[in-house]
Design a protein with these regions (language model features):
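NTP/phosphate- and nucleic-acid-binding module
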Residues: 2-368
Length: 368
């Protein structure tokens, strides 16, 4: 922007302006024309006065050793995938694997983003989880559909609300040059729809290019048919930070209760909650000794909190706001007959259980 000197990606400007993925389908010339014709405003200053589009290297460049010349130039990896491709034959032979099979990796990636933002949604250094699934040519679209469904089911198992998820297939103009099919799983963040998980059919482009440059054979010999081929690849790629952000946004809830008060609560699915249970003595003076005893026992099985300060209602709220699924209250009944009150975070309903039943009860609720 010439007015406020803020840099933006042209495709993101158009996407945000239209609340669609139109910017991804246009050429640079078409993007410039669209921005001018529609007077797309700068998100910061509101003016529509932009420079022409400039090419921008998304890879971080540095130098290895003490000299800074072209021979010592190196780049931080923008994805983890290529390390898997160059090790394809090594893994296949050492593990004696038959196609189809997959190789997964978790690691740091680096991208020189023009406009990082929206908390941890777009950052320059991030943790990436990628799977390269190698399959026989001709079967890749069946596996592509399989992983689309598998990835969505995984997100639903984390408690992500289905109404905030959508699968968006890339059209031909938007497809990367190496792909014959790509789908983004998008989540409806507070700032709008954003890509969470990309599933791409990368054909055999990567292995073929590594073969071409390295002169090493990366072909697979099918032991059943004696057929030799370069496998096709299905790649589900997920950023850990974006998944964390999705889980946080999905869990945050602000509720108005029947008495007119409001409460803020993180409704994590119990398996994902950082703390599983909080132990609360009803009256510190009379119940804290028994409560501490129970706290130590539960801590052997779960991440457990202990809170004895303030009235019980405020302690429930403190537990709710950090997403603890279960609050166990120790009272006179505990001292007399070894029963406790267990409060559910989401429904606020309470039940009475024997102390010896607690671990099994919580474990069952946390089944994933």
């Amino acid at each position: 922007c010439k007015e406020c000197k803020t840099r933006y990606r042209a495709d993101n400007l158009i996407n945000d302006f239209t609340n669609s993925n139109l910017g991804d389908t246009l050429t640079n010339e078409e993007r410039v024309s669209y921005i001018k014709d529609n007077k797309v405003p700068c998100p910061k200053c509101g003016k529509s006065n932009f420079t022409d589009i400039r090419e921008f290297n998304l890879m971080f460049k540095t130098f290895q050793g003490v000299t800074e010349d072209s021979k010592s130039a190196v780049y931080l990896r923008p994805e983890t995938a290529q390390g898997i491709f160059v090790n394809f034959m090594n893994v296949q032979r050492s593990m004696r694997l038959k196609v189809p099979f997959g190789i997964g990796q978790v690691g740091k990636s680096f991208r020189n983003e023009i406009t990082p933002g929206n908390f941890i949604f777009r950052v320059r250094e991030f943790e990436q989880m990628e799977l390269e699934f190698f399959c026989k040519p001709g079967t890749e679209l069946d596996w592509f559909k399989y992983y689309k469904d598998k990835c969505k089911d995984f997100l639903l198992s984390l408690g992500i609300k289905e109404e905030n998820l959508r699968l968006r297939d890339h059209d031909k103009e938007e497809l990367s040059f190496y792909s014959n099919a790509t789908t983004d799983i998008e989540y409806k963040f507070p700032f709008g729809w954003g890509e969470l998980w990309g599933i791409a059919s990368r054909t055999n482009y990567d292995l073929s290019r590594h073969m071409e440059v390295s002169k090493e054979k990366l072909e697979y010999l099918d032991p059943d048919t004696n057929e030799k081929y370069v496998p096709y690849v299905i790649e589900p790629s997920l950023g850990v930070e974006r998944l964390f952000l999705t889980v946080l946004c999905n869990a945050y809830t602000k509720e108005t209760l029947t008495d007119g008060t409001t409460r803020e609560v993180m409704k994590f699915t119990p398996a994902l909650a950082p703390y599983k249970v909080t132990v609360l003595p009803l009256v510190k003076k009379f119940h804290s000794e028994k409560a501490l005893e129970l706290y130590k026992e539960l801590s052997k099985h779960f991440m457990t909190m202990y809170d004895e300060g303030g009235n019980i209602g405020k302690r429930y709220r403190r537990s709710d706001v950090i997403g603890v699924p279960f609050a166990v209250t120790i009272d006179d009944e505990t001292l007399n007959n070894q029963t406790v009150t267990v409060r559910d975070r989401d429904t606020m309903e309470q039940i009475t259980l024997k102390v010896e039943e607690l671990v099994d009860y919580i474990n069952k609720k946390m089944e994933f």
